[in-house]
């Protein structure tokens, strides 16, 4: 216990003597928290710049333009006289979409001779494109039905009969757990911890690697009385306390001033957060123990942190990725923390619903403990090499030519797997891996539950259509809506058709 306290005091002195640690351990995480707390604004995509190409210039076309201007999603910034100018503005990102009202639109709409409204949107930006597509459809839907409504009213048909005729089956959509479709509710919390885990990985690797890099590993191990567990625990404990304090502060900020809905136990959320931080440190210890070269491993853990951001399942569902990528996602602590946190945030789930994720986080600690003897072997090897290099050489050093230095460095690069990994990963393989992760491109076979209380031919036809849709897969049918909600709470289904 005395050795542990001595290692902790030594590490605390190292931390307070260099401003680098203050910046990485305190300032950067707080900046990330401030950034994620403010980046999404009110949580809605509003006032997206769009344009209108009105080639009809009639009362009907002007009414459509007013509808577009009144929609909160749109901000009409330009009116164009031809489509070429609108397309050029879209390519330059001056606007993100535009509506084309063709010539003689009003005449065709009144006579029912195939009036068409065409809208274009920038779908390379997926979130913006999806928002614009939904907004265009919702805003222009009444316009598409207006000719039929006008003719029916002229024939004396009541408004209720028109509504029944146009929409015999009305869909009622209920976005559960985020009814306002608020981006901040869904993204602020996981994105902060995704950034946070990268800082934890880098700090942990640097704090251990600097001992070997600057030749103080022998002193560090000697102060721990040769016990590598005491040495690593004493070194990382100050960082664990600082990171845990920031993680708990982030939870209070996200679920307090930001008003992210959370009805679960904040104590349990804080406990899982601390466990996630320790598991991330354990992953960093494991990676560094495999190949303790700080210059290369810092690049490797940066890649690991970036991959964890994708494989956490926040930006694209991991279940929709290829099977090898899906399996690899479980090698990242942030994946399991995200699953546990989302179960508590969205479903108000108890520990029984995410105990597997918590148990997996403990496995990272076990892996780090098992590899500590290898880290100790590397440290002792470094100490022996330093002792040999410090002994006086009987032969005076010979001057090396420039060609000899170049050959030596080239041989080091060609024979060092860590350097090759960093170069290949950063330049080529890393990009291929990201393309492979997003290769499915579309979410397919998303599991849904069906609650059919009608048992009619029409309801069975709807279910057959659901089976035939490539984006969905019917997980099960039940007459009990509460059972379907339970499936969703357990993460077995992503939606319910009632």
Task: Please tell me what each predicted stretch does.
Residues 1-184, 391-498:
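Extracytoplasmic/periplasmic domains immediately adjacent to an N-terminal transmembrane anchor
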Residues 3, 21, 25, 235, ...:
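Residue-level signature of transmembrane alpha-helical entry/exit and packing/kink sites
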Residues 13-17, 193, 229-242, 246, ...:
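Alpha-helical transmembrane segments of multi-pass membrane proteins
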Residues 24, 28, 197, 201, ...:
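Hydrophobic alpha-helical transmembrane segments of multipass membrane transporters and ion channels
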Residues 36, 57, 88, 241, ...:
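Membrane-spanning alpha-helical segments of multipass transporters and channels
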Residues 127-144, 177-192, 211-222, 243-251, ...:
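Hydrophobic alpha-helical transmembrane segments
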Residues 188-207:
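Long, hydrophobic alpha-helical segments
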Residues 203-242:
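Helix-loop-helix units of permease transmembrane domains in multi-pass membrane transporters
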């Amino acid at each position: 216990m005395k050795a542990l306290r001595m290692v902790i005091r030594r590490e605390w002195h190292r931390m307070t003597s260099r401003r680098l640690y203050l910046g990485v351990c305190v300032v950067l995480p707080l900046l990330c928290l401030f950034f994620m707390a403010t980046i999404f604004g009110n949580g809605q995509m509003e006032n997206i710049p769009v344009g209108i190409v009105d080639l009809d210039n009639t009362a009907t076309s002007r009414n459509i333009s007013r509808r577009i201007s009144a929609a909160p999603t749109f901000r009409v910034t330009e009116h164009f006289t031809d489509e070429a100018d609108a397309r050029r503005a879209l390519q330059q990102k001056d606007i993100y979409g535009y509506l084309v009202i063709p010539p003689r639109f009003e005449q065709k709409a009144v006579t029912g001779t195939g009036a068409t409204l065409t809208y274009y949107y920038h779908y390379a930006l997926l979130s913006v494109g999806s928002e614009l597509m939904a907004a265009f459809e919702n805003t222009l839907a009444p316009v598409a039905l207006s000719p039929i409504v006008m003719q029916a009213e002229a024939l004396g048909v009541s408004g209720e009969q028109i509504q029944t005729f146009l929409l015999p089956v009305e869909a009622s959509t209920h976005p559960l757990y985020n009814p306002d479709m608020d981006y901040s509710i869904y993204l602020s919390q996981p994105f902060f911890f995704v950034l946070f885990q990268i800082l934890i990985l880098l700090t942990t690797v640097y704090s251990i690697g600097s001992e070997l890099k600057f030749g103080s590993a022998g002193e560090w191990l000697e102060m721990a009385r040769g016990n590598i567990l005491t040495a690593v625990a004493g070194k990382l404990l100050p960082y664990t306390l600082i990171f845990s304090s920031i993680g708990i502060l982030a939870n209070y900020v996200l679920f307090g001033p930001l008003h992210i809905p959370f009805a679960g136990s904040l104590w349990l959320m804080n406990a899982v957060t601390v466990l996630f931080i320790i598991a991330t440190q354990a992953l960093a210890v494991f990676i560094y123990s495999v190949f303790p070269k700080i210059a290369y491993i810092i690049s490797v853990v940066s890649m690991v942190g970036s991959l964890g951001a994708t494989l956490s399942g926040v930006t694209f569902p991991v279940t929709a990725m290829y099977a090898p990528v899906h399996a690899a996602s479980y090698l990242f602590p942030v994946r399991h923390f995200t699953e546990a946190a989302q179960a508590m945030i969205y479903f108000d789930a108890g520990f029984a619903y995410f105990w597997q994720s918590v148990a997996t986080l403990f496995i990272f600690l076990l892996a780090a403990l098992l590899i500590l003897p290898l880290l100790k072997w590397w440290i002792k090897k470094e100490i022996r090499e330093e002792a040999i290099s410090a002994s006086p050489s009987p032969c005076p050093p010979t001057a090396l030519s420039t060609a000899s230095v170049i050959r030596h460095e080239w041989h080091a690069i060609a024979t060092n797997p860590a350097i090759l990994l960093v170069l290949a990963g950063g330049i080529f393989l890393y990009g291929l891996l990201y393309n492979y992760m997003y290769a499915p491109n579309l979410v397919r076979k998303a599991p849904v539950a069906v609650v059919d209380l009608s048992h009619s031919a029409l309801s069975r036809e709807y279910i057959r259509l659901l089976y035939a849709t490539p984006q969905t897969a019917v997980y099960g049918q039940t007459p009990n809506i509460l059972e379907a909600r339970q499936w969703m709470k357990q993460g077995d289904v992503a939606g319910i058709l009632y």
